[in-house]
Amino acid sequence: MNTEKDRLLTFQMWPLTFLSPADLAKAGFYYIGPGDRVACFACGGKLSNWEPKDDAMTEHLRHFPNCPFLGNQLQDSSRYTVSNLSMQTYAARFKTFCNWPSSIPVHPEQLASAGFYYMGHSDDVKCFCCDGGLRCWESGDDPWVEHAKWFPRCEYLIRIKGQEFISRVQASYPHLLEQLLSTSDNPEDENAEPPNDLSLIRKNRMALFQHLTCVLPILDSLLIARVISEQEHDVIKQKTQTSLQARELIDIILVKGNYAATIFKNSLQEIDPMLYKHLFVQQDIKYIPTENVSDLSMEEQLRRLQEERTCKVCMDKEVSIVFIPCGHLVVCKDCAPSLRKCPICRGTIKGTVRTFLS
């Protein structure tokens, strides 16, 4: 029974439809009966009374954590790149869940088995291998499915669950990456903001990128009002193109909040009365798409998202975290954990994807 193929052959009389023989065989089990009783070829552990939400690998880990087969499968990181070596074992990951909120409907055993460890606040978890982060867990969520849904290239996931499982999950969400790369500035699941200055700037963010040309005087006004620091001022001023300065300016205003929006509004009224009128009075400023972004490769779309490399929170380190599901890439890995909502669109952050593009 040392091979997965041999174990799979024992399931010809397997009685359950909700748990596949392939998953059980991959987790080290072969069928012995009666009923739904299976045994591990390596540790001899026996399990039965399976339920619809059970995952074979998770249950194997939970009941027989010292199984040598699991040790070989889960702890040998020599074949794939690991983001956090200290969390490469199931035991290490499981220990991080000692203060896991009891109100969260997903169990630590499931999360640790799927490669996640607890970050210590709210319900934030991160994969030890791909560094993908998830939060906002709901009843019925399967950690393996969510792992495959958002981080299909994770090498740990591929090794443990197999490409067939990942492809099946991805096929259930055919437009997921397009959604992630659409970078919507108006998340549908958020309560509408009152129509104030900040919300108008947020709503017309992309249009302002195109139409705003008087960046430096507004930047100086923000510095004089002590809304931004000299470092933040200089980072934006040093951009070589006005369009790049405009992007940075608008995004830092969205991060700083209402007072920054008020300074922007007052400065714009003096410096560019026509743009002020279209944005704040008539509210008819238009964004003109210059090209069909969907025609670009996924990698090129990410490269363009990463064009502005400075984190909009610390204005120091490079951006490296894409928020799920809004797709905005505006913060570094150190600033991301403290944020619950995207500073650009105010959408709830349900997960993070780390980018490594040069």
Swiss-Prot record:
InterPro entries assigned to the protein according to its UniProt record, in alphabetical order: BIR_rpt (IPR001370), CARD (IPR001315), DEATH-like_dom_sf (IPR011029), IAP (IPR050784), Znf_RING (IPR001841), Znf_RING/FYVE/PHD (IPR013083)
SMART domains given in the database record: BIR, CARD, RING
ZnF locations on chain (RING-type): 311-346
GO BP terms: apoptotic process; negative regulation of apoptotic process; negative regulation of necroptotic process; positive regulation of protein ubiquitination; regulation of cell cycle
Sequence positions that bind Zn(2+): C127, C130, H147, C154
Coiled coil regions in record: none
PROSITE patterns found in the cross-reference section: BIR_REPEAT_1, BIR_REPEAT_2, CARD, ZF_RING_2
Positions annotated as BIR repeat: 4-70, 90-157
Gene3D superfamilies from the UniProt entry: Death Domain, Fas, Inhibitor Of Apoptosis Protein (2mihbC-IAP-1), Chain A, Zinc/RING finger domain, C3HC4 (zinc finger)
Sequence intervals crossing the membrane: none
UniProt KW Cell wall biogenesis/degradation keyword: no
Domain CARD: residue ranges: 193-283
UniProt keyword terms in alphabetical order: Apoptosis, Metal-binding, Repeat, Zinc, Zinc-finger
PANTHER family xref list: BACULOVIRAL IAP REPEAT-CONTAINING PROTEIN 3, INHIBITOR OF APOPTOSIS
Protein name (record): Putative inhibitor of apoptosis
Gene transcribed to yield this protein: PIAP
